[in-house]
A protein has these predicted regions:
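Hydrophobic targeting segments
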Residues: 1, 26-29
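Soluble or luminal CAZymes and related metallo-dependent hydrolases
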Residues: 6-10, 73-81, 195-199
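Short, well-formed alpha-helical segments that are part of the catalytic scaffolds
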Residues: 6-21
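Active-site-proximal specificity loops/subdomain of glycosyltransferases
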Residues: 30-88
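Short aromatic/hydrophobic "clamp" motif used to bind/position activated sugar donors
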Residues: 94
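Active-site acidic Asp-centered loop
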Residues: 97-99
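Catalytic core and acceptor-binding pocket of nucleotide-sugar-dependent glycosyltransferases
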Residues: 103-110, 115-269
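Membrane-proximal basic amphipathic "stem/tether" segments
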Residues: 261-335
Length: 335
């Protein structure tokens, strides 16, 4: 587990649950939050407690709508905690997960077994399983290739060490669009970015291409049909993206985003479909899983309406109650 202490519940409960779901596992808590360290220090199930210095955050990834919505870019301090925790692991297979998330079953092991049926790229021992939450499909409203979720990793220790062994994100990149214009075709969502890349892109691009000079994209929404096709052909050799429902992932902080990540992010079904197309001789098929989110045929027709300036103008002026009502409807449609 890596991250800070959350007030939602005591983390000792998720530690206990994890030890039951994965018998004989080694539990490591890696944090820069002294309050969390104190809360779990006496838990006999915690095999290793790693406390790092808080190296601070960068300016917010996106331009906030107002001062109360500032969420600073924590990529560098996140990587310190994650990497130290993974390096300390004694086992060859590692699950790295946020402190506010937990797996409620061991279904991830079934997907892990399925992933072994497909080849791995040179220099990698296997694939890393991650979640759909913000593993963005760039064919929809946010055209950002290589934006694969950084919230959870399950895979070989050496691969996850490589994933987090990236250069520090530069301050110049964190403030990129303060000095550089967004590319002309950027939509409203893409123009909210202050940072040159998303955190998820910085990690994924380095993991796949090793050095920035090899990156196939120049900035967060650098895309065209060829870039997207290459992205989908590449990432499936390195990652399996799994929908939370397929791996029993509890992520309450992102419950309101369920309709978004179920419809506009990659699901287990879609990833195995891509693998099936690339490796047609394998016996594993996408029929092991079900499609998530709204029917893409209908969503493609709805999306231009939902994201039109007039619709966004109206939505912004709705009361919080009505906005939440719309979210509930979309979440229901996305089930």
């Amino acid at each position: 587990f890596s991250g800070p202490k959350y007030n939602d519940y005591c983390m000792n409960y998720t530690i206990d649950l994890t030890s039951k779901i994965f018998p004989n596992c080694e539990i490591i808590v890696s944090t820069n939050d002294r309050n969390l360290a104190s809360a779990v220090a006496n838990n006999p199930l915690v095999n290793k407690l790693i406390i790092s210095d808080n190296i601070g955050e960068l300016p917010s990834l996106k331009y906030p709508e107002n001062s109360s919505k500032i969420i600073n870019n924590n990529i560098n301090k996140q990587n310190v905690c994650c990497l130290k925790g993974v390096l300390a692991a004694s086992h060859n297979i590692v699950l790295r997960i946020r402190t506010d998330q937990v797996l409620l079953n061991n279904n991830i092991l079934k997907i892990w077994d399925l992933s072994k049926n497909f080849p791995s790229p040179l220099g990698r021992k296997g694939k890393i399983i991650t979640s759909s939450i913000f593993s963005i499909n760039p064919r929809y409203s946010e055209r950002m290739p290589y934006h694969i979720s950084d919230m959870l990793q399950f895979g070989y220790k050496d691969d996850i060490i490589s994933y987090f062994s990236v250069p520090n994100y530069p301050f110049e990149y964190a403030t990129w669009y303060e000095r550089n214009p967004h590319i002309e075709y950027s939509n409203k969502l893409e123009r909210t970015f202050r940072s040159k890349f998303a955190v998820e892109q910085w990690l994924t691009l380095h993991y796949i291409f090793n050095k920035e000079e090899n990156f196939p994209i120049r900035f967060h929404n650098d895309f065209n049909d060829r870039i997207i096709d290459d992205f989908e052909n590449n990432f499936i050799d390195y990652f399996i993206i799994a929908h939370p429902k397929d791996i029993g992932l509890r992520a309450p902080k992102f419950k309101d985003a369920e309709s978004y990540y179920s419809t506009q992010c990659y699901s287990t079904f879609e990833v195995f479909k891509l693998l099936e197309n690339k490796y047609p001789n394998t016996k594993i098929t996408s029929t092991n899983f079900t499609a998530k989110g709204m029917n893409k045929k209908y969503f493609n027709k709805l999306m231009p309406i939902i994201y039109s300036p007039f619709a966004q103008f109206l939505i912004k002026r709705l009361s919080t109650e009505n906005k939440n009502r719309i979210k509930r409807i979309l979440n229901h449609l996305a089930k």
